[in-house]
């Protein structure tokens, strides 16, 4: 049974803060944005969180393909910033989009790859015949401590994917995962901001896992980078995905459509899935997309995706990634700190 993407949707908050504005407050060098290849990032409104972002992305996915929500048999929401420690985000999504009560829900966590883990879980349930459609979501309102390196990129946004076996806009030809116990990034319960290993998050974490998963999938399928029209890699900044693509043999032209981090920052669980959505926004029938996520802790999920003729029927029925990027409203650090709850008494 072929399994793949029936529809997709994204949501990116309209508020933005320039990386240079953050650097100004902390007295950092002026070229930090160029060094990161991230120039601004998305900031949630005062009433936005992972749940509201997930709902908006899911609504866009439902409306794009005119899907009956009652057909959805599973909702898996991946995030590292769920609004409740004990209360599922997915139940909020299900109620908001009008699902029947005959569906299973679980919230997933695996740092920035929780969304692709949700996608794999939906694939398994659909392929087994247990459900008709699954809804996989990756969304975050990520946090970085004031003055920490993470603050320049930690952003907000999310993407939702409806997974099924019929009416596919893109078939998932295969998936492969690579996982180890690598403590490059962590946050204990009750601690407001995560800690990280600095440069340790690069070679032994991001690059090792992304490259291992990517090479594993290409070996499994007997494919090479030149067999793909596009490639999407997790985007913690604008440098890592460009570098890992080159190491694997992909070109800058292949990754350009999905490289959105310079404009919206690192949306964590939404990062890879928003990059995929940006690519689907312009991919043509018959073209192939290679996707690899990364989550600290650490692991990567790789996917080989082939776009079908149906993409042209539904693509323009909901806002695309570039539509959200275009409606930016800029704020200063004081308002940003208020929006992010950084002012604590």
Swiss-Prot record:
InterPro entries: ACP_syn_III_C, HMG_CoA_Synthase, Thiolase-like. The keyword Acyltransferase applies. It catalyses: acetoacetyl-CoA + acetyl-CoA + H2O = (3S)-3-hydroxy-3-methylglutaryl-CoA + CoA + H(+). Gene3D superfamilies: 3.40.47.10. (3S)-3-hydroxy-3-methylglutaryl-CoA binds at residues 29, 112, 153, 201, 234, 243, 266, 296. CoA binds at residues 199, 239. GO terms for biological process: farnesyl diphosphate biosynthetic process, mevalonate pathway; isopentenyl diphosphate biosynthetic process, mevalonate pathway. Keywords: Acyltransferase, Isoprene biosynthesis, Transferase. The active site is at residues 80, 112, 234. It comes from the Archaea. GO terms for molecular function: acetyl-CoA C-acetyltransferase activity; hydroxymethylglutaryl-CoA synthase activity. Its EC number is 2.3.3.10. It is an enzyme of class 2 (transferase). Pathway: Metabolic intermediate biosynthesis; (R)-mevalonate biosynthesis; (R)-mevalonate from acetyl-CoA: step 2/3. Interacts with acetoacetyl-CoA thiolase that catalyzes the precedent step in the pathway and with a DUF35 protein. The acetoacetyl-CoA thiolase/HMG-CoA synthase complex channels the intermediate via a fused CoA-binding site, which allows for efficient coupling of the endergonic thiolase reaction with the exergonic HMGCS reaction. Catalyzes the condensation of acetyl-CoA with acetoacetyl-CoA to form 3-hydroxy-3-methylglutaryl-CoA (HMG-CoA). Functions in the mevalonate (MVA) pathway leading to isopentenyl diphosphate (IPP), a key precursor for the biosynthesis of isoprenoid compounds that are building blocks of archaeal membrane lipids. Belongs to the thiolase-like superfamily. Archaeal HMG-CoA synthase family. This is Hydroxymethylglutaryl-CoA synthase.
């Amino acid at each position: 049974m072929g399994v793949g993407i029936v529809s997709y949707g994204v949501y990116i908050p309209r508020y933005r803060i320039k990386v240079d504005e953050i650097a100004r407050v902390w007295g950092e060098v002026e070229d930090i944005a160029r060094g990161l290849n991230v120039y601004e990032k998305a900031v949630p409104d005062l009433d936005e969180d992972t749940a509201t972002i997930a709902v908006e992305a899911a609504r866009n996915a439902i409306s794009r393909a005119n899907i009956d929500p009652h057909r959805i048999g599973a909702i898996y929401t991946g995030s590292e910033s769920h609004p409740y420690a004990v209360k599922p985000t997915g139940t909020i999504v299900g109620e908001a989009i009008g699902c029947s009560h005959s569906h299973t829900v679980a919230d997933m966590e695996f740092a920035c790859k929780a969304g692709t883990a949700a996608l794999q879980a939906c694939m398994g349930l659909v392929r087994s015949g247990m459900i008709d459609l699954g809804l996989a979501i990756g969304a975050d309102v990520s946090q970085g401590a004031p003055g920490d390196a993470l603050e320049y990129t930690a952003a907000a946004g999310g993407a939702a994917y409806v997974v099924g076996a019929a009416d596919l806009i893109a078939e998932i030809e295969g998936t492969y995962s690579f996982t180890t116990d690598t403590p490059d990034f962590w946050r204990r319960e009750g601690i407001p901001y995560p800690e990280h290993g600095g440069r340790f998050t690069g070679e032994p974490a991001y690059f090792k896992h992304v490259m291992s998963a990517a090479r594993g999938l290409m070996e499994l399928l007997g494919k090479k980078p030149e067999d793909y029209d596009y490639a999407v890699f997790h985007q913690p900044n604008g440098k890592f995905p460009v570098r890992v693509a080159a190491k694997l043999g992909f070109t800058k032209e292949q990754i350009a459509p999905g490289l959105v981090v310079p404009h919206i920052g690192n949306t964590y669980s939404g990062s890879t899935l928003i990059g995929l959505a940006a690519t689907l926004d312009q991919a043509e029938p018959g073209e192939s997309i290679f996707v690899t996520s990364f989550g600290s802790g650490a692991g990567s999920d790789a996917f080989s995706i082939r776009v079908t003729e149906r993409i042209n029927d539904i693509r323009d029925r909901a806002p695309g990634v570039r539509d959200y990027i275009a409606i930016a409203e800029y704020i200063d650090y004081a308002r940003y700190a208020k929006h992010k709850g950084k002012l604590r008494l």
